[in-house]
Amino acid sequence: MTRSWRRTPAGPLLRCRVALVAAVSLGVVGVACAAPSALPPPLAGDYSHYSLPDGAEILPPTAVVPPLPPDPSSCGALSSLRPDPGLRPETAPPGSALAAIVARGRLIVGTDQNTNLFSFRDPSTGTLSGFDVDLAREIARDLFGDPDKVEFRLLTSAGRFDALERNDVDLVVHATSITCERATRVGFSSVYFEAFQRLLVPEGSGITSPADLAGKRVCTFIDTTSLATIQRVAPEATIVAVPDWDDCLTTLQLGQADAATTDNSILAGLAAQDPNLEIVGPNLELEPYGVVANKNNDALVRFVNGTLERMREDGTWNRLYDRWLGLLGPTAGPPAPSYRD
């Protein structure tokens, strides 16, 4: 039986709920602040009439959404290029993306600042932090001997592949699920994390599974695999599709959605900001994450896979998991890689 999960308030990542109507009227929702000594109460009153986040769409049960993608193992998308032990920065193939990065002297990585635990703006320092941020820094460490030689550019989930194809960034490290369709457009590293889609609900809501979502509003994200999954398992729910993961926290706090759904790793980051929320229900869909490069940038993908191999072997992956994702529970270790030549 799958047990529900909830986060107790701790640390600077906790986001306070805003209890004052005046604050809500100014659009100040989910404001970052120091951890309180007791659980903050849920918002009092009805704020469901407030405008939805910019770019949000309401999709009724009859809406046609992209179909659930096939299992990525069925098309070989989970098999990435084998690391080359002889591939080093100084031996990068001339004219390759890897050689251009080495010549530039820094790595440019696309991510976002709204995915708590993976890539977020630390309110105490103002710097980008999280599992994905540290992963990018490890790639820079292997490229230049210096984890600080990385430039982060902020992207939305919807714009990450376009930014890559415009060569605005060298890599995308942004909690990106590997799918068959995406693998025809971009190159993926080996799997560096496996998440499972679940539900995030207000504590005491009575929602414990997708069967409880009939007639309810469920927040999820535009252009993600989560949208197709929730329509399949909760066909009578209305979907609130938003462009930014943090928008689901806002819609839940204002009563504009009854539940949110996406990867449990991302939901845990939202729940860490509001202790009145809990993760419930069964695992709905496996979501394997990969680092993303432009299609045919083979040397760069092999180099990234070499970094991931090193992180598995020297314990770096486990240290990053314990630092950022330990609230998900004990880990069996990093996913085993699958390679092709």
Feature map (PLM): residue ranges:
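Beta->alpha turn/N-cap motifs
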Residues: 111-115, 154-158, 167-179, 203, ...
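Extended ligand-binding regions for polar small-molecule ligands
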Residues: 53-92, 224, 291-329
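Short loop->beta-strand "edge-of-pocket" segments that line small-molecule binding or catalytic clefts
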Residues: 108-111, 129, 210-224
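Bacterial signal peptide processing site
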Residues: 34-37
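Periplasmic-binding protein-like
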Residues: 193-201, 268-305, 327-341
